[in-house]
Design a protein with these regions (language model features):
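A general structural signal for short secondary-structure boundary/capping elements
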Residues: 82, 99-104, 164, 185-187
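C-terminal non-catalytic interaction modules
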Residues: 1-6, 12
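Residues within HEAT/ARM-like alpha-solenoid scaffolds
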Residues: 7-10, 24-31, 44-52, 68-71, ...
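Solenoid-like repeat scaffolds
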Residues: 3, 38-45, 77-86, 120-130, ...
Length: 203
């Protein structure tokens, strides 16, 4: 049993070493990670397989492979439900935020389902002690895309009333607020909001 564990551990570590090569394209890194996941799954190492899948989602995000990201994350959520002893829900939430954002971009996913995924994300962040800031941020971004400026304003107000925490991305929010002010013709507001970015106060 120990020898078997050592063998697959070394096989996975060898693949991970290859992913450290900065000249690799994200697609090549993704393929190496998929092979590592296959080995972890074969050996029923759920904890490691989950870590590897979260890394894979990062590479798939760079490739804009939305549908594939969603499939990978669905597997992570299934594994979490069956292995709450080894997988911490909190570790999944940042990537869940990405996944929910992906669902808006896929026309084959009906809006009802997108909303249901958003509600599930909302439930999970609340029970892990996070504010709803990231939830409202996502909806405000999508309303701008849909040119629903009044609705976007409602979500922005709600977002700004929630506390900033580890699920928030201040630079993303600032970037988005600039888009909102520019889209709605509030150029003075956009200019004053842009100062921290111009002065490199927010990265």
């Amino acid at each position: 049993e120990l020898r078997k564990r050592m063998k697959y551990t070394l096989e996975i570590q060898k693949l991970l070493l290859q992913t450290q090569n900065d000249s690799l394209h994200p697609r090549e890194k993704a393929n190496l990670l998929k092979e590592a996941i296959r080995i972890a799954d074969e050996n029923e190492d759920v904890e490691w397989a989950t870590e590897l899948r979260l890394d894979l989602i990062y590479e798939l995000n760079l490739l804009s492979a939305d549908a594939e990201e969603i499939t990978v994350f669905s597997k992570i959520l299934d594994d979490y439900e069956n292995h709450k002893d080894v997988i911490k829900e909190e570790d999944l939430l940042w990537k869940y935020k990405w996944i929910w954002a992906c669902t808006f971009d896929l026309p084959e996913i009906p809006m009802e389902q997108v909303k249901a995924i958003g509600e599930d994300y909302k439930t999970r962040i609340l029970r892990n002690g996070y504010s709803l800031r990231s939830y409202y941020h996502r909806w405000s971004v999508e309303c701008i895309w849909m040119r629903q400026y009044d609705k976007a304003k409602e979500y922005i107000d709600k977002m700004l009333n929630e506390k900033i925490d580890d699920q928030s991305c201040e630079a993303c929010e600032l970037n988005f607020m600039l888009d909102y002010y520019l889209e709605t013709g509030q150029f003075d507001e956009a200019y004053s909001r842009a100062q921290p970015l111009i002065n490199k106060q927010v990265t």
